[in-house]
């Protein structure tokens, strides 16, 4: 009679066979990721091909070391072991190592991190900083023994001697390289003495260049307040540092040229051009003012300054005539008024009233004559003052008494306000004029 086994007994037997079978202790599988959903710790999903599906498990410690993110539909190669789960009688693969099929894990990680940081906006042009034209200090984050620093020093010294180069000696590949690169970028920003920062290294494999693809390096470059030039690998190599840096150079020499956009020879040539332009401008300005001066010295007003007040004299004569006419009119009107009063007095027959009115009339006449005399004297004095004021405008009389008329830009200067040192002034004198330059200005408080 056959012996019947319990389900658990059979399951334990099968588990023992799985665990002791040398072919199942370490299995190599290739398949497509299915039913994947990112979990906080351990990852559970399926691997499938056209004919079968198998459950797989990745413990959290292993998953964190993969170096890339699993995605639904991704084809991967895995190394693991078979495990049977007794309560359900199902088996699965416990993955110990995995990598994308056909393309390296670093390449996948590169694309995934590039996509992530790109979506955050780290590579946008609006964040790129311009390079200064005349840097005084250039920082270099690279290996102290490589050709990169030698090429940069040689190129900068040739293009613009005197620019100081500050080296931040850094490990550029291997464990801890990315952290050191990021730390030195932040250190350079904390000191705030650099105008430009170059980060770079020579060529190599993607593994050799990986320190410049790690997220900590990329974020340190993005956060840098100092403009960063990336010069990593050869011209055909591309790193995430190239995308986030403000400028990218194919070689260390090209990076040094970007950092010193204006050479010493360029600057000397520019200064010579400016000097020539200034000389031409000064010469043209002198010719212009010399021509204006010649025209002024030949003008009628300059040769016959009395014409300056001819119009004022004519106006003074007109005012004098108008004043005399007004006085005559006023006197005539008052005489007429007196006559009217006399007629009225004669019409009033009483002698006392006539006498009173005659006395009043005489008094008014005396007052009128007195007022007329005062008015006349005032008008004559006013005419005399106007005449004297007009004579004071005669520049020939002013300079004849030993004074000089000061002009700036053909305008008469009445105060030291507005006059500065090195201003050019013109002094008009009795027998000529002087062109002078102000050496010192001493103002008096009024």
Curated annotation (Swiss-Prot):
Subcellular location: Cytoplasm
Keywords: Cytoplasm, Exonuclease, Hydrolase, Nuclease
Molecular functions per Gene Ontology: exodeoxyribonuclease VII activity; nucleic acid binding
EC top class named in words: hydrolase
Organism domain of life: Bacteria
Chief location: cytoplasm
A Gene Ontology BP annotation from the UniProt entry: DNA catabolic process
Gene Ontology CC: cytoplasm; exodeoxyribonuclease VII complex
Keyword check for tRNA processing: no
One Pfam family here: tRNA_anti_2
Catalytic activity: Exonucleolytic cleavage in either 5'- to 3'- or 3'- to 5'-direction to yield nucleoside 5'-phosphates
Enzyme Commission numbers on file: 3.1.11.6
Subunit comment: Heterooligomer composed of large and small subunits.
Similarity comment: family membership: Belongs to the XseA family.
Cross-referenced PANTHER family: EXODEOXYRIBONUCLEASE 7 LARGE SUBUNIT (PTHR30008:SF0)
Summary of the function given for this chain in its UniProt record: Bidirectionally degrades single-stranded DNA into large acid-insoluble oligonucleotides, which are then degraded further into small acid-soluble oligonucleotides.
Protein name in the entry: Exodeoxyribonuclease 7 large subunit
Organism: Streptococcus sanguinis (strain SK36)
